[in-house]
Swiss-Prot record:
One of its GO terms (biological process) is double-strand break repair via homologous recombination. The keyword DNA-binding applies. GO terms for molecular function: 5'-3' exonuclease activity; ATP binding; double-stranded DNA binding; helicase activity; hydrolase activity, acting on acid anhydrides. This is ATP-dependent helicase/deoxyribonuclease subunit B. It is an enzyme of class 3 (hydrolase). Keywords: ATP-binding, DNA damage, DNA repair, DNA-binding, Exonuclease, Helicase, Hydrolase, Nuclease, Nucleotide-binding.
């Protein structure tokens, strides 16, 4: 018998050496049997390669994969089955099985018995953490109860192990009919003495370490060998990377783990040094030597060249993968002998790339196998189960959408299910119906009265409403059926049966089967996982009292722990994998992506219940007890093995290696080069340099490096042509168009100008009518962005209504309370300033109570949250009324009209009550009629000479003369025109001012309060009685002494408290104020008329350019627009802002500019 260890560095060809040895024994011993053992992950590729190479030694065709009865290639688990010829009859225990039992135990245990875990035991994820920790302990060959006496201290670790042992003792009896995943190996180890292993030889390749169960099997084989059970001529040979001599860095040594394995388990074996060298390129041979020297002695013996190795950096991850895909495709084209299966793409973690790689590799038509598990928790079946069981609110919007958007529940035979669901979603977002509404009311997305004629539009509207109500009834039936059946469930056996029957009754299993028939088997995999979980629940806790919360958590844990199985890369595909996964070592080319300091080496953190500090204690405990330690390593120990993982990963390829990383991370932070590569790039180590890869070719000579498929090249070249001009890609255009006709359209896009065309007159008439009937806000919208005006008022597009208190609803609520309160004062002929604060509060609250009973404001009493919002809005109005009340005490003004409408309205009653509107004749003889509504008109003096226009605003608006000049601030001036026209009907001679009133809905500014020496307890809490004195009316005030005296009497050196004007010490008007002279007012009003007519003329001529106003770098007309996705504003396509910074800001300069323009006209 012979136990041998074959050692060598990663540049050595272990496989050929082992096969030559097998071949020699094969030739001279016809009775010998050979078992070639490799890690499970590379079993298939290794089997093909081993048998092919062995066939070559025998003189067979080197291209055939020979299967010899005397030479078998196995993984350890497959070896156990092959030699015992039996499968474990017990069900393999899963994390889910243990989680189910742990959860049940934790629910039954008194909380005080959980000791250190008493607080965390009820937190999400704790059950899964306990289950994972117990499984780790069991896989090490021990139980928590066996570990407990090894730790002879009364400390935190002892408390943890006691709780784990307590839980363990309660669940193990339930697991007697189950086996651990590695039990087959342990069972095989115990049965070896009974198995005929005569003439058997075992060769292990590719292992850098063994689990506890694997090691038990290895030890059993060695023991059988020593007892000559295998025969005197048999041998067991292990290949082990490294050498024993280079151990000066301890745990940080490159070969530390391999050396520890040799020292602890194979010290009596005969060591055999591999002489065969792998066919590595110069770069790979030099990498092996340089990295080995750096990691074993701290320096390299000489500087080496790396001609087949590159380090490249790209701007971001997408461009990084685009470079990799482009480079791979060019290699495959340039080298006909190179196959896709010869290429490996590696990353430490693929998480940040798993969505990018498929998209870009598909664009380049590259076949690939993504060797990365995808979790099942995002599958629609998981979402369906979790949302059916998870919400107490049966008709909650999110629950409804998550259940019925899965595509697993539908009415049969018709294809309008999704359309109906879309319409229903619009209704739910706008109305948020409660369960009572669902059951008792018909939903109307589009309001239709019984008197409306059944024209085509109304027929469609009725069909939409009917479709919504069909969906409503369908959903009620589905959800009620589920609720009724689960209401009868008393234990988990019934729960399992009920859920399964309900899903099959709804034909969910058939939907998933149909998906599988169409090529997507993920649903079938998820369905099998669900059935497996239900079986485990039924077997383990079927007779326990049912808890829907716990049942839901069991299902969620099951979906979260499961992954979709992929098809191995057995065809001609590029392998995309992670460096922690064992790979074969005969790839021709390696692309190591994300080679940045954030990923390489990997940073690991322990999240298990037994943390790193605990593990260090246990290692010491096991050492003192002279017992082998097979629990997981600490995070630090894992990180010390990173250098060997990097070494092995890079040497997975024989020819070339390309390291790449992106300068910009997904989180927006900057990447730097990996410290591993920085060491390799040192001037005294290698000639490696970092090559920056531009996103686009920088010269015509570079174009060839950016070409791939027709599709990928079209994307690159169109961007290049956009940046450098079409001449830059001259010569390639015709070729690409032949390969991909769509490229012609891409090139045309280079000349695309994203500007709307002028509309034809007939379309204008259909959209806006013969004459224009507009509001002032509509004209302001036109000047703010003409194209958005067209979308909103021409096409009448509007965003989807949502059940929320937005600015429009709160504004309407504010105005309605103001209107009711002021109208009651007008009706009672009560002066505003005669009221007390208490009377104002009573009037406000009575008005608010009247309003929330109206349908328009039903949202404000729909739940506690919105009732609180209503109280807050009412408080805002009350505070504003109090502040206006204080201002009113300084003069004799009194409100005489609220919500004063001017312009033609629909009903006769409204027409009688409204003021005369404004109308102007346009360029082609058509008319523009303006309508509006003035929030409030005050009679400012006892002689009824002056009136003041008041407009409520919730955004602290002030009158901006620059906005008035460009047309986005026309409201106050147009109101002034309307009131001047209607002054006799109102009861005043003329308007004297037009001002905005800010509704006080801003939180108190603490810093401003302190600056005004106001104590904080006057701003917050029960004593909040004093407001920061910054309340003022802002707008336009006529510079007339009689008018100003009726606002507030101001002496020299004083400023008006509530209006923006004052006097200097010399009695002159202050420069910065809202005052305008009569002459300047005339200019402003004429300019206002001009802008109104100008907008009308442009509208009737169909001019709606995409030309949004831009006030500053932070704010433009697009900042809060609902139409940005339609407009696609892009300066690259010729779009420009109407930048206000090019106009003067000074009031006098702007009025002079208006006067000049008026003179020109």
């Amino acid at each position: 018998m012979t136990l041998e260890i074959v050692r060598g560095f990663a540049d050595r060809d272990f496989r050929s050496e082992l096969l030559e040895r097998i071949y020699e024994k094969y030739r001279i011993d016809p009775q010998a049997r050979f078992f070639y053992i490799v890690p499970n992950h590379i079993k298939f590729s290794a089997e093909v390669d081993v048998l092919k190479k062995f066939g070559s030694l025998l003189g067979k065709n080197d291209q055939e994969a020979q299967a010899f009865s005397r030479l078998q290639v196995y993984s350890l688990s497959r070896l156990a089955w092959a030699l015992t010829k039996e499968r474990d009859q017990k069900t393999i225990i899963s994390n889910q099985s243990v989680s189910i039992l742990v959860g049940q135990v934790l629910r039954e245990l008194p909380i005080e018995k959980l000791n250190i875990f008493a607080r965390s035991a009820r937190m999400p994820g704790f059950v899964a953490n306990v289950a994972e920790q117990l499984l780790e302990i069991w896989r090490s060959g021990l139980t928590a109860s066996e570990i407990l006496p090894l730790h002879q201290f009364d400390d935190r670790l002892s408390e943890k192990i006691k709780v784990l042992a307590l839980i363990e003792t309660k669940i193990l009896p339930s697991l007697k009919d189950y086996s651990l995943p590695d039990d087959a190996l342990r069972n095989f180890a115990t049965q070896i003495s009974k198995i005929d292993l005569k003439n058997c030889n075992f060769y292990f390749e590719g292992f850098s370490g063994f689990t506890a169960s694997e090691l038990s099997l290895v030890k059993a084989l060695i023991s059988a060998d020593r007892k000559t059970q295998l025969g005197k001529k048999s041998e067991i040979v292990f290949s082990l990377t490294g050498e024993q001599q280079s151990d000066q860095y301890g745990e940080g040594n490159l070969f530390y783990r391999a050396n520890q394995l040799f020292k602890n388990e194979f010290s009596s074996a005969r060591v055999w040094i591999v002489s065969n060298i792998r066919p590595l390129s110069e770069s790979q041979l030099n990498f092996e030597q340089s990295w080995r020297e750096l990691e074993t002695q701290g320096f390299t013996s000489q500087k080496r060249s790396f001609p087949q190795t590159k380090i490249v950096v790209s701007s971001d991850q997408e461009h990084e993968i685009d470079f990799v895909a482009r480079s791979i495709r060019q290699r495959l084209v340039d080298n006909p002998k190179l196959r896709a299966k010869d290429i490996l793409v590696l990353a430490q973690r693929l998480d940040g790339y798993k969505n990018i790689i498929p998209k870009i590799f598909d664009r380049y038509d590259l076949p690939y196998f993504l060797d990365k598990d995808t979790r099942m928790s995002d599958h629609p079946l998981a979402s369906l189960a979790e949302n059916l069981l998870g919400s107490s609110n049966e008709f909650a919007y999110e629950r409804i959408m998550k259940i019925f958007r899965t595509g697993l529940l539908s009415w049969q035979l018709e294809d309008n299910f999704q359309t109906a669901l879309d319409y229903l979603e619009n209704y739910l977002l706008a109305n948020n119906p409660k369960e009572k509404n669902w059951r008792q009311e018909e939903f109307q997305l589009i309001q239709i009265s019984d008197e409306q004629d059944l024209n085509d539009d109304h027929k469609i509207d009725r069909q939409i409403n009917a479709l919504i109500n069909r969906m409503r009834l369908f959903i009620i039936k589905i959800l009620d059926d589920f609720q009724e059946k689960f209401a009868k469930v008393e234990n988990y056996h019934q729960a399992v049966k009920t859920l399964y029957n309900w899903l099959t009754d709804q034909q969910v299993d058939q939907v998933l089967l149909n998906q599988a028939n169409d090529g997507d088997d993920r649903g079938q995999q998820t369905w099998k996982l669900l059935l497996s979980t239900l079986d485990e629940v039924d077997q383990l806790i079927g007779d326990k009292k049912y808890s829907q919360k716990d049942f839901l958590q069991i299902l969620k844990d099951g979906f979260a722990a499961a992954s979709f199985s992929g098809i191995p890369a057995s065809l001609d595909q590029i392998t995309v994998s992670e460096s922690g996964i064992v790979q074969r070592n005969d790839f021709k080319a390696l692309y190591f992506i994300d080679a940045s300091d954030a990923s390489l080496p990997a940073q690991t953190n322990s999240s298990s219940l037994i943390d790193d500090f605990d593990r260090l204690q246990l290692i010491d405990d096991f050492s003192k007890a002279q017992k082998p330690y097979y629990l997981q390593d600490t995070s630090r120990q894992e990180m010390t093995a990173e250098n060997f993982r990097f070494y092995s990963s890079v040497l997975s390829a024989t020819d070339s290696v390309t390291f790449s990383y992106s300068k910009l991370r997904l989180d927006g932070k900057q990447n730097e080069l990996s410290p591993y590569l920085r060491r390799l790039s040192l001037k005294n180590v290698s000639d490696l340099k970092i090559e920056k890869i531009p996103d686009l070719p920088q010269s015509q000579a570079d174009l060839v490096d950016y070409l791939g498929t027709a599709n990928s090249s079209a994307a690159i070249l169109s961007q290049t042509a956009q940046n450098f001009g079409e001449d830059f890609i001259d010569g390639l255009t015709d070729l690409l168009i032949k390969r991909n006709p769509y490229f012609q359209r891409i090139l045309q896009a280079l000349h695309y100008n994203n500007q709307p065309v002028t509309l034809r007159p007939e379309l204008i008439k259909k959209l806006f009518g013969e004459d224009l009937r507009l509001s002032i806000s509509q004209i302001e919208k036109y000047y703010s962005n003409p194209y958005e005006y067209f979308l909103q008022y021409g096409l009448r597009l509007k965003k989807r209504n949502q059940f929320t208190v937005d600015a429009a609803l709160s504004g309407t609520y504010y105005h309605s309370i103001f209107e009711q309160v002021i109208n009651r004062l007008i009706g009672k002929r009560t002066d505003f300033h005669d009221l007390s604060d208490q009377e104002l509060k009573k009037l406000s609250q009575e008005s608010a109570q009247n309003l929330i009973e109206l349908p328009d404001f039903q949202i404000l009493q729909s739940d506690d949250h919105f009732r609180a919002v209503a109280r807050s809005l009412t408080d805002d109005v009350l505070l504003t009324l109090k502040l206006m009340h204080r201002a009113n005490r300084l003069n004799n003004s009194r409100p005489i009209k609220t919500e004063a409408v001017f312009g033609k309205l629909s009903s006769d009653q409204q027409r009688e009550q409204s003021l005369s509107g404004l109308d102007f004749t346009l360029a082609n003889g058509r008319k523009i009629y303006l309508r509006g509504k003035v929030d409030r008109i005050d009679q400012q003096d006892l002689e009824h000479i002056f009136g003041t226009i008041i407009d409520y605003k919730s955004n602290g608006k002030v009158f901006d003369f620059r906005d008035a000049y460009v047309g986005t601030e026309l409201q106050l001036l147009t109101y002034w025109l309307a009131l001047s026209k209607n002054s006799s009907r109102i009861g005043i001679n003329q308007p004297g001012g037009a001002v905005f009133v800010q509704i006080r809905n801003k939180p108190a500014d603490i810093s401003q309060a302190l600056a005004h020496q106001i104590q904080l307890d006057q701003l917050i809490g029960d004593r909040a009685k004093q407001q920061v004195p910054d309340f003022q009316f802002h707008g336009i005030l006529l510079d007339d002494q009689n008018y100003l005296a009726n606002l507030q009497t101001v002496l020299a050196g004083q400023k008006a408290k509530y209006y923006n004007f004052g006097l200097t010490k010399k009695g002159q008007k202050t420069a910065r104020s809202d005052l305008v002279s009569k002459e300047d007012l005339t200019v402003l009003l004429k300019h206002d008329e001009k802008k109104l007519v100008e907008a009308g003329n442009k509208i009737i001529h169909g001019e709606f350019p995409l030309y949004p106003i831009k006030k500053n770098e932070q704010r433009s007309a697009l900042t809060y627009s609902d139409y940005t996705e339609i407009m696609n504003f892009d300066r690259n396509f010729g779009n420009q802002y109407n930048n206000l910074t090019r106009y003067p800001k000074n009031k006098s300069e702007l009025i002079s500019k208006m006067r000049e323009e008026e003179g020109e006209n």
